[in-house]
Amino acid sequence: MRGISPKRVCPICGSTEFIYDPRRGEIVCAKCGYVIEENVVDEGPEWRAFEPGQREKRARTGAPMTLMIHDKGLSTDIDWRDKDIHGNQITGMYRNKLRRLRMWQRRMRINDAAERNLAFALSELDRMAAQLRLPRHLKEVAASLYRKAVMKKLIRGRSIEGMVSAALYAACRMEGIPRTLDEIASVSKVSKKEIGRSYRFMARGLGLNLRPTSPIEYVDRFGDALGVSARTKKRAKEILNEAIKRGITSGKGPTGLAAAALYIAALLEGEKKTQREVAEVAHVTEVTVRNRYKELVEKLGINVPI
């Protein structure tokens, strides 16, 4: 994987061994699990070659097909530079003709309402994913979900922004890169309530059977935002694993549980964080952190130092 420098050293344990997680776009320390870098973009080809012959066969010119462009990136553009094949400047009536051709090409590419709506939806999806710093493959999954919803006519009568937000939220859950509804709403043009409604409608319409998000999936991201050690994150995961085994987490929000487990783990490891700090990172209220904290401490019999 390009981008992992051999001179890089883990700031926690001093290791120089790292693992690249392509699903999450993260570089992680192989020994302690500390996230060294997030949102890493793999700029290499999506194919692999083990000999020169394979490389020659699989290499190709042009950008790969993508669901993130309304025509899947299969169209060809007339070059914006007024030059011929030899690099000479085109002048006079030929230049005017080229300009008219470009204008008609733009019009013909998006020539009906459905195409315009799809182009707008995918541009919104790209904007939101960029603001949330989500990896490219996740955007492709979200675009695929949105296109399926269009084909099944689920978009009719609903806001484009709401359904795009729902597709992005569903893609995050499918790919194991959890983002809360609050986080999606923070970059969307519609409310959290509308995103939730649109998501449930899309899930029913497309038959998406997504498992509930585990609170453990939020620990690393929340822990990094709080600046706690790898030990604290590991302890928080142990607390949550035990809580899941005993059925304590059933029916409770995963973000609140992750926040409470991190709060407890930080206290146990001597890295005290306030309930307000933890609540802000997890996008929950201090009351939620406090309630989940009490439940975990009491039901797991944890002795927390005061």
UniProtKB/Swiss-Prot annotation:
GO cellular component assignments: transcription preinitiation complex
An example Gene Ontology biological process: DNA-templated transcription initiation
Superkingdom in the source lineage: Archaea
Start and stop residues of the Sequence repeats: 123-206, 217-298
Database matches in InterPro entries: Cyclin-like_dom (IPR013763), Cyclin-like_sf (IPR036915), TFIIB (IPR000812), TFIIB_arc (IPR023484), TFIIB_CS (IPR023486), TFIIB_cyclin (IPR013150), Znf_TFIIB (IPR013137)
Binding site for Zn(2+): 10, 13, 29, 32
Pfam family, one: Zn_Ribbon_TF
GO terms of molecular function: DNA-binding transcription factor activity; TBP-class protein binding; zinc ion binding
UniProt keyword list: Metal-binding, Repeat, Transcription, Transcription regulation, Zinc, Zinc-finger
Residues in TFIIB-type zinc fingers: 6-37
Matching HAMAP family: TF2B_arch
Family the entry assigns: Belongs to the TFIIB family.
Function per UniProt: Stabilizes TBP binding to an archaeal box-A promoter. Also responsible for recruiting RNA polymerase II to the pre-initiation complex (DNA-TBP-TFIIB).
Official protein name in the record: Transcription initiation factor IIB 2
The species this protein was found in: Thermococcus kodakarensis (strain ATCC BAA-918 / JCM 12380 / KOD1) (Pyrococcus kodakaraensis (strain KOD1))
Lineage start: Archaea, Methanobacteriati, Methanobacteriota, Thermococci, Thermococcales
